[in-house]
């Protein structure tokens, strides 16, 4: 968390988002010190909504006032909503926001994706590469509290983080963003 993480109008803004009526979350980032398949990621903003329709989520993201270079979201957002008859991705498109998704097995694999994202929290030298403005309170809380289910001896060990409905949405949005901006190469799903 750093106060000096600020919006730079000369740099593109990218978005990772996780759809959901009960909890929806979007993170807005800019890249610094970009290399071939890595960069410092500066999270400049967030949208965190509860009990909100997808159209309201899209409008809130638009209201931040950034011009978005790329938006990546949950592939499940391409499924048709039974009540509206259109997908979350189509709702965003109707608002002028094109959401990109990848459906390949490696990108969609949660275990591989979480492992990939860890590089930004701490690299092999112990240095962070994800820097977050303090106003992104819900993202910060989620990143600090994302966890795995408690293991009991009578259960199979779970390799996927706990879907708690509170902290997983921001973390999923970050995963969708980073696995698409910086694709996982030469890895197998799982």
Q: Predicted regions span which residues?
A:
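ATPase catalytic-site recognition across NTP-hydrolyzing enzymes
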Residues: 1-17, 22
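Short, structured patches in soluble enzyme cores that scaffold and shape functional sites
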Residues: 19, 28-30, 45
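Short beta-strand scaffold segments in enzyme catalytic cores
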Residues: 24-30, 175
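Short loop/turn segments immediately following beta-strands, especially the blade-tip
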Residues: 30-36
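Mg2+-dependent endonuclease catalytic cores in nucleic-acid-processing enzymes, primarily RNase H-like
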Residues: 36-162, 182-188
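Outer-membrane beta-barrel pore domains
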Residues: 162-164, 168
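Metal-dependent nuclease catalytic cores in nucleic-acid-processing enzymes
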Residues: 171-183
């Amino acid at each position: 968390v750093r106060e000096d993480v600020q919006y730079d109008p000369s740099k593109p803004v990218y978005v990772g988002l996780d759809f959901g009526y009960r909890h929806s979350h979007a993170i807005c980032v800019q890249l610094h010190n970009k290399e071939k398949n890595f960069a410092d990621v500066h999270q400049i903003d967030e949208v965190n909504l509860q009990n909100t329709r997808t159209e309201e989520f899209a409008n809130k993201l638009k209201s931040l006032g950034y011009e978005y270079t790329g938006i990546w979201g949950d592939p499940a957002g391409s499924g048709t909503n039974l009540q509206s008859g259109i997908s979350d991705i189509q709702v965003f498109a109707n608002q002028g926001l094109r959401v990109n998704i990848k459906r390949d097995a490696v990108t969609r694999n949660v275990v591989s994706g979480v492992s990939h994202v860890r590089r930004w929290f701490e690299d092999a030298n112990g240095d962070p590469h994800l820097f977050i403005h303090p106003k992104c309170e819900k993202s910060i809380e989620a990143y600090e509290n994302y966890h795995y289910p408690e293991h009991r001896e009578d259960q199979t060990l779970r390799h996927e983080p706990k879907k708690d409905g509170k902290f997983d949405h921001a973390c999923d949005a970050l995963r969708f963003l980073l696995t698409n901006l910086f694709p996982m190469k030469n890895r197998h799903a799982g």
